Amino acid sequence: MGVDLMHLWAQMGYFAKGVVVVMAIMSIYSVTVMITKLIQLKHSEAATRRFAPQFSRAIQEENLDQAISLAEKNKVGHVARVLGGALGEVKPLLRDRATITSADINSAERAVERQMLITLSEFKRGLGVLATVGATAPFVGLLGTTMGIVNAFTGMAQQGASGGLAGISAGIAEALITTAFGLMVAIPAVWAYNYFSTKIENLTVEMTYTSKELIDYLIKSVGSEFGRSIFTKEFQAQKAVTGSGQISG
């Protein structure tokens, strides 16, 4: 025997109908986030698949102008956005390697970090909705179920022994259907949240790896001096001035 949803809707009380409406809104909102997020990440991945090999090749060939041009033209891909932020920060210095200092390298690293934070914030926008829907929809449905069962047994008490099981069956069905709706809303939201979270973690690895590749290129392009820590360089400079290994206070 099938379930007549229209009949159940007609038999529902105002509270149960309100619960169903709330869950319908939650479902529409979460599906909208899923579609928007899927399109956003797919476009970003496609753009990065085109950009990353070209950029890596340009870096390996030390074709700086081409690398900068690629980063500036690709604004959709997550990797291009991160590298574009770093290159935009130090582009005038990159064209003249003799002027690059450790402060410039640090500036490029900070630019990468800032752009990664912005990009990740955009990627994660909406995930909170999926997490909230996935966590609360079953409880919203359970609330409707609880109130439906209360109403069913209240009706049974009013009818007395003459009502029997038939007297409360409609109320029980009304109560349980809200739990089913809650699970139908929550399960896709939880699946989507886990999927997008994993996908964003993978994109973060791609951004981190490629940005490190750029920073390594900048360090190598100005010599091995930047392979040493700032403290080591300051210590050696002080040692050269004082002629000893101790730094005076």
Give, region by region, the residue ranges found by the protein language model.
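Hydrophobic alpha-helical transmembrane segments of polytopic membrane proteins
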Residues: 175-189
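Hydrophobic membrane-targeting segments
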Residues: 1-55
